[in-house]
Regions:
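N-terminal membrane insertion elements
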Residues: 2-61, 65, 69-72
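Metal-dependent catalytic cores of enzymes that make or break cyclic nucleotides
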Residues: 38-39, 43-44, 50, 63, ...
Length: 265
């Protein structure tokens, strides 16, 4: 709410002038600014109401800017840590981020939502960093017990991400990226619109990269195989609109590389 004061004479505003002068260093400039905005006889309260409203907006902007720098630094740090522990996962996350961004653009989603999806994709598997490395990087098929452990990574990632002040629902998006429309996904078994749109986009991008790319236990199966999976199960596992946008955006693509789409600066 705007700052308001009750006195009706100029001298009654000296405490405010003193405060502003102490902060900005020139009472004459403040006085001239007030006159230029409201005239020689303008009510001083108008000036203070305006000034403190501006102050409030500047504070909000500064807070938003700090939050932006915080999440950018966090994402970069996570990427570096993941790369040092598991280069495959780090590369996978970058490719998924490119692909998810391309799908979201193809869908015509708002720019801010696209950026939120990209950021979530960059850290969507970070929960694996809290799991035993020998399981995450195992060069063979996983046992049922190991699979159950791996399935904890969305929840682990969400718990970590909740500690960061993201301007998007990043923790929830990461938590839900293995959910499926028919409720067969994990960890919550969500169905349909219970799954965030951001997570539905991320899910398709994740599956396409996982199938087409090399895994620790098998070679890559190629982009055509991945797209057949998406096409076959659209409307069942995967959101139909997201799946169609993916198929359109990758039409004619033979390989999926980390520079398929350009990262925003």
């Amino acid at each position: 709410m705007p700052y308001t004061v009750s006195p009706q004479t100029e001298t009654d505003y000296w405490p405010e002038y003193f405060w502003l002068t102490k902060k900005y260093g020139d009472s004459e400039k403040l006085h001239e600014l007030r006159k230029s905005l409201w005239g020689q006889k303008g009510n001083p309260s108008d000036f203070f109401a305006w000034f403190f409203t501006v102050e409030s907006h500047l504070a909000e902007f500064d807070s938003s800017r700090r939050a932006t720098e915080t999440y950018k630094t966090f994402v970069k740090t996570v990427s570096l840590l993941t790369e040092s522990q598991d280069p495959y996962t780090a590369k996978h996350q970058k490719k998924v981020a490119k692909l998810a961004q391309g799908i979201a653009k193809e869908m015509g989603l708002p720019a801010d939502m696209i950026e939120g999806i990209r950021v979530a994709a960059m850290v969507h598997d970070m929960g694996k960093m809290s799991l035993p490395t020998e399981i995450v990087t195992k060069p063979g098929a996983l046992t049922p017990l190991e699979i159950s452990i791996i399935k904890e990574h969305p929840r682990r990632g969400c718990e970590i991400l909740k500690e960061v002040d993201f301007p998007w629902p990043t923790p929830e998006t990461v938590l839900q990226h293995h959910e499926r429309l028919d409720g067969s996904g994990y960890p919550q078994g969500l169905k349909g619109d219970e799954i965030r749109l951001e997570a539905r986009v991320l899910a398709v991008a994740d599956v396409v990269e996982a199938i087409s790319g090399r895994r620790a236990y098998r070679p890559g199966l190629g982009i055509e195989t991945a797209l057949k999976e998406i096409d076959k199960h659209k409307g069942v596992f995967y959101d139909t609109d997201v799946a169609r946008a993916c198929l359109r955006s990758l039409k004619g693509t033979k390989t999926l590389t980390a520079d398929q789409w350009e990262f925003p600066k």
